Amino acid sequence: MGRAEREAFLAEPRVAVLSVVSEGDRPPSTLPTWYAYEPGGTLTVVTRQGRRKSRLIRRAGVLSLSVQRPEVPYRYVTVEGTVVRQEPATEADLRRIGARYLPAADLDGWVAWEAGGQNANGTPEVVEVRPDRWLTGDFS
């Protein structure tokens, strides 16, 4: 895929798989995640402050994120990038990501739930990543 095509593919609302180096002799931590991306910009994910994924990302300072189209013809885009921001998520951060995945009627309630600290998994944290390397596949 060329630059414009891979960036457009990544900008579509897909569930991504995020990988970050783990501790000790454990394999990389690999988890599904929501994300936001606009062509030419940075990649943004939300995690939880103090949780394992957040700690690993902070320690490593880099991560990989992969999205795919599971139907024939298969396609995928993987981004390897450097963390440029990791801090408490604002309502604007939550809204930007949530709007990609939730029906409009549910977005305000979800943002209020997350921003209000009602998620038992912890306080939302935004991680912003600068894409450094792109890997793509197109089996059409």
Cite the ranges covered by each PLM segment.
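Extreme N-terminal tail/first-helix region
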Residues: 1-15, 73
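A short beta-turn/loop motif at secondary-structure boundaries
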Residues: 24-27, 70-73, 117-121
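Short secondary-structure boundary/capping segments
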Residues: 7-8, 35, 55, 117-119
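Short, surface-exposed beta-strand-loop junctions and turns on beta-sheet-rich folds
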Residues: 51-53, 72
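Charged, gly/pro-rich active-site loop segments
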Residues: 75-140
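Alpha-helix boundary recognition
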Residues: 10-11, 58-59, 98
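Short acidic (Asp/Glu) patches
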Residues: 50, 61-64, 107-114
